[in-house]
Amino acid sequence: MTLTFGSNSKTAFLFPGQGAQVVGMGLELYERSGAAKDVFGKVDEALGRPLSKILFEGPEDELRETINAQPGIMAVSLACVGAMNENLDKDDIPDPVLMAGHSLGEYTALAAAGVLSVKDAALLVQKRGELMQEACDSNPGTMAAILGLDEMTLEEIARESGTFVSNINTEEQIVISGGKMAVARAMDMASARGAKKVIPLRVGGAFHSGLMESAKAGLIEALNNVEFVEPNVPIIANCTAQPLKSAEEIRGELIRQIASCVQWKRSVDFMIRSGVTNFLEIGPGKALAGMVKRIDRNANISNISDLESILAFSKN
């Protein structure tokens, strides 16, 4: 599910991760775009269940489950890609020089860049969600967002509290994870050291931390059963904030990523240093756009999440 590229603008495509889900997402695309409907059909067929029904109708608690939220967000993002190709002239679609996805969104980026088929991406994302849930059951944990402290301070707090730094989203928005008691200690320590805000996250476990190590073996097995094609656009890796250019690099990244910190700020910084001035977030929500704006106030940011925003984008 690759975009038909057009202009030569210095644009990066961004794909959101878990947390962007909302009941009803993708329904308008399904009803009004044949290409989007085809994406939802392929995902449902690959998973052997009517995931799209959960996306469109809920209930919210069921949609929030990792095995539904992750492939669901990916499906909506790829449906947006399909609808863009279907409804915009080639010259209206910016030619991305780089792509990146936040956590789960990295898999969406791989599909958009032609590395994975929609079917294989859906199966991998569902398997990843199952493995993460199993790891959560074996090693219960949670996460918290810390606002207003720098990375060095959070690294110190993580060492002292027995937690992990899991997402470095912006200079002052960092997520920690670990066992529930350890995260509670870290939150208290962060508050004592001057954090502007400490926010416990409603998540099912300590994602992107050492507590997810047990998920790697199953993921390696799943990745070995999938064919990877060389990307037609470099993808910025979550773990290293460097471009992935080969199938071998991509496999290694996906294995590391499940239990490692998402280096989102460094990823955006790399894209900016590479000359990117325009960022297009494709999929539900606007979380990544907000992060990019906090990283670089001068960045030009657009969002594509439904047919209305796609048609409006063509007029820009």
Where are these regions (language model features)?
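FabD-like malonyl-/acyl-CoA
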Residues: 2-153, 278-308
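Alpha/beta catalytic cores of group-transfer enzymes, especially the acyltransferase/condensing modules
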Residues: 19-20, 47, 113-259
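Charged catalytic carboxylate motif
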Residues: 35, 72, 76, 182, ...
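Conserved functional loop/turn residues at catalytic and ligand-binding sites
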Residues: 103, 227, 275
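Non-catalytic positions within long, well-ordered alpha-helices that form the structural scaffold/packing
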Residues: 191, 272-275
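Short glycine-rich catalytic loops that host catalytic nucleophiles or stabilize transition states
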Residues: 200-203, 272, 305
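Short hydrophobic/charged patches on amphipathic alpha-helices used for structural packing
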Residues: 265-269
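Short, charged, surface-exposed secondary-structure boundary motifs
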Residues: 310-315
